[in-house]
């Protein structure tokens, strides 16, 4: 199966798994085929749950310890900005490339090969922690580019793969279970990593702590690669007709930019993420370098936001179902600019934990309401793997610009402090200049969009708690990243069930 051409996993008469000895069925007996399919399906779903835990050991380190590692390597303010900017832009381009290549190449080998490559990249981080070369920060930026490039390259193919495997009736429970496993494993690794780094700092061997942490991450990704290799793909060959569909989707995307509602939404999401990126890399700098938090305190601070985001997603889901997305977007848009200001009030560890709880609540609502909003305003019958990838590319460009600007501001902030001595009387850190600028620009973006945010007519979609909002990544500062993995039915005489990857291509999803 290729992106947007779903298999029909609910039909017991599907062909057995091609190329797999365990699915070779003698004769054409429908019962034998159904039994064979049940065996590989159960095995693959079980492997996928194990793979979630294995891969979480890597993502928990990559998404949350890169900035801390850069600070250990004595990264400059500008380099901290580039560490966020360049990998995000390259990753979005890799996602578009993956969506295109998926029309020509089988997806399972693409996923497995990229996962193995990512393992090598993380091993490179181990070597970097041990060697600590003179230009270590630049090597870190290069490895981060490859790391996030691999993550984004895998994403479209993984979604399509899972969309063809997980049966409709089990989809909500399966992804809810997978998300819980990912969350628990990630938080354990995150907290354990912070404790490990704090202990190694006390012993004067921080490099060993980072090397051990990245070695665990590499081991997790290697195990993940093996589990992905063992999983079954029921539709391994790309569909030739999808190539035409890809080009049609690009044309639809260009046409959709003439839709004022979608255009305003796209610029809003990209703009907000861009101005947030101005300060995103520097909260770690503020905690570790200015406030002298231990690595464990740094980890707990981030965990407070992440846990709050997970715990409040269901609340926001029920709230948006009842009152609509616009009111949630309004609340979150007006609260997001306040968050960096709250960071400037007190350096107390417990106070900043409370700030992160507030941040998690707001970012959870923002992520869910904007995902719902996009779902309701999207063009009909569009290939949303391509559509979402292009949307991500626009946001990545904004993040690149914002993080680069943040690095420039942070680099010039100490000089500004010297020129304007009165700033030192109420600013504990030059980084407060960055926080102040991002707060102002967040307000500007919010005030620009709010008058333009019309409540669209909601489309019928599965209830939030039953479906299939997959948390693909999480970040303490910029919020969770959500993927829709919803279910639709094609209006055909045979009533075929259509499952999609990230977003639906059919016009009207049905409640499960």
Please report, for each region that a protein language model flagged, where it lies by residue.
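Juxtamembrane intracellular "pre-TM" segments in multi-pass secondary transporters
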Residues: 27-45, 232-267, 456-504
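Transmembrane alpha-helix termini and helix-breaking/packing motifs in multi-pass membrane transporters
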Residues: 67-72, 100-104, 126-131, 186-208, ...
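Helix-loop boundary and gating motifs at the non-cytosolic
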Residues: 24-93, 98, 118, 123-124, ...
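Helix-to-loop junctions at the C-terminal end of transmembrane segments
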Residues: 94-109, 197, 312-325, 410
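Glycine-rich segments within core transmembrane alpha-helices of 12-TM secondary carriers
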Residues: 90-92, 176-194, 392-407
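Intracellular juxtamembrane helix-capping segments at the cytosolic ends
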Residues: 153-166, 365-380
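Hydrophobic core of transmembrane alpha-helices in multi-pass small-molecule transporters
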Residues: 53, 121-122, 135-154, 351-366
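Structural signature of the two symmetry-related core transmembrane helices
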Residues: 109-125, 218, 327-342, 439
């Amino acid at each position: 199966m290729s992106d947007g051409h779903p298999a029909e996993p609910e039909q017991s008469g599907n062909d057995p798994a091609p190329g797999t000895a365990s699915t070779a069925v003698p004769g054409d007996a429908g019962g034998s085929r159904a039994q064979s399919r049940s065996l590989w399906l159960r095995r693959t779903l079980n492997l996928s749950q194990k793979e979630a835990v294995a891969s979480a050991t890597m993502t928990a380190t990559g998404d949350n310890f890169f900035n801390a590692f850069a600070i250990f390597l004595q990264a400059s303010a500008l380099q901290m900005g580039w560490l966020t900017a360049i990998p995000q832009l390259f990753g979005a381009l890799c996602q578009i490339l993956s969506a295109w290549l998926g029309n020509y190449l089988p997806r399972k080998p693409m996923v497995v090969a990229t996962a193995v490559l990512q393992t090598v990249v993380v091993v490179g981080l181990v070597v970097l922690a041990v060697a600590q070369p003179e230009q270590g920060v630049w090597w870190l930026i290069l490895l981060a580019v490859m790391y996030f490039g691999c993550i984004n390259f895998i994403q479209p193919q993984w979604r399509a793969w899972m969309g063809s495997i997980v049966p409709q009736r089990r989809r909500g429970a399966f992804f809810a279970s997978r998300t819980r496993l990912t969350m628990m494993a990630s938080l354990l690794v995150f907290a354990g990593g912070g404790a490990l780094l704090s202990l190694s700092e006390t012993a004067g061997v921080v490099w060993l702590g980072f090397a051990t942490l990245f070695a665990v991450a590499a081991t997790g990704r290697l195990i993940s690669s093996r589990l992905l290799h063992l999983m079954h793909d029921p539709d391994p060959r790309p569909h030739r007709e999808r190539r035409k569909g890809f080009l049609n989707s690009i044309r639809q995307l260009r046409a959709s930019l003439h839709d004022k509602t979608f255009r305003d939404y796209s610029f809003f999401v990209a703009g907000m993420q861009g101005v947030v990126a101005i300060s995103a890399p520097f909260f770690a700098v503020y905690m570790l370098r200015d406030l002298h938090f231990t690595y464990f305190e740094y980890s707990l601070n981030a965990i407070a936001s992440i846990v709050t985001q997970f715990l409040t997603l269901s609340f926001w889901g029920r709230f948006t179902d009842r009152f609509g997305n616009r009111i949630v977007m309004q609340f979150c848009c007006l609260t997001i600019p306040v968050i960096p200001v709250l960071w400037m009030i007190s350096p107390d560890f417990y106070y900043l934990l409370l700030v992160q709880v507030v941040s998690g609540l707001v970012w959870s609502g923002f992520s869910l309401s904007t995902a719902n909003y996009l779902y309701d305003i999207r063009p009909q019958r569009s290939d949303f793997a391509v559509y979402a990838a292009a949307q991500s590319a626009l946001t990545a460009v904004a993040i690149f610009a914002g993080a680069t600007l943040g690095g420039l501001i942070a680099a010039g902030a100490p000089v500004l402090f010297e020129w304007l001595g009165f700033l030192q009387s109420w600013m504990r850190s030059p980084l407060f200049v960055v926080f102040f600028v991002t707060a102002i620009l967040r307000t500007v973006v919010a005030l620009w969009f709010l008058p333009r945010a019309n409540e669209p007519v909601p489309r019928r979609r599965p209830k939030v708690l039953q479906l299939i909002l997959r948390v693909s990544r999480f970040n303490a500062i910029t919020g969770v990243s959500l993927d829709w993995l919803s279910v639709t039915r094609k209006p055909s005489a045979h009533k075929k069930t259509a499952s999609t990857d990230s977003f639906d291509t059919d016009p009207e999803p049905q409640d499960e």
